Amino acid sequence: MNPFFPTTKKESFSSWKFRTLMNWYPMYFGTGGKILFWSSDSSELHVRLRLYIWTYNYVGTLFGGSLFAAADPFYMLMLFRALGPNYVVWDKSANIRFKKPGRSTLYARYLITEGDFAEIRQTVLTAGELTKNFLIQWVDKDNVVHAEIVRECYIADKQFYQTKKGDSQRAKLTFKRSEK
C-alpha cells in the first residue's frame, strides 16, 4: 500500500508483518485506525483514520477518542523496536488539542529523525534516562491540521532503569518496616 506521505524509507517484510499484526490486534483494531506504512528501521510510520460508524460522534465528525486512541502506542513501539533490548521505553503522558472537526478521513505521520536518535542515545549514555516529547498531527488530504497530540516518552538504559526501580522498591519496603 502506498503511504499517504511521501517518503524515501522502505518497508521490509518484517515491518510489513508487524504492521499487519498490529492492524489486526483487537485493542488497536477497535480504534478504527489503520497503519498504512511502517519503515524497516522503525523511524517512520503512517496511520489513517476513516470517518465511519465506529469513529464518528453525535454531531457526525470524527470522535476525539478515536483520534486519541488511534494515535496511542506508536512512538513507544517505534523507539522500542529501533533502540533495541538494552533500552526501556514507556509512554508517560499525552495531550490532544483539537483544531478543526474531522469531517473526512485523516492521516498521521510519525517521524523520528537520526538527530532524535542521536540525542536519545547520547543523553541516555550520559544521564541514564530521558523524557522526550513527540508531536503527532492529524491532517486531511489537503494537509489541513485537525488535531495535534503531544506524546511524552520515557527512555532509559535498561540497567539504569532496573537499578532505579530496585532502589524505589527498597525504599518502599524500608518505609513499611519503619511504620510497624
Features from the language model and the residues they span:
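Alpha-helical membrane-targeting segments
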Residues: 1-30, 54, 58
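HotDog/MaoC-like acyl-thioester-processing domains
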Residues: 2-12, 102, 113-180
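Catalytic strand-loop segment that frames the active site of acyl-thioester-processing enzymes
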Residues: 30-61
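A generic structural signal for short beta-strands and their flanking turns/coil linkers
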Residues: 31, 43-45, 90-94, 104-108, ...
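A short, structured loop/turn motif at beta-sheet edges
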Residues: 38-43, 99-106, 139-144
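Hot-dog-fold acyl-thioester-processing enzymes
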Residues: 54-74
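Hydrophobic beta-strand-centered segment that forms part of the acyl-chain substrate-binding groove
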Residues: 78-115
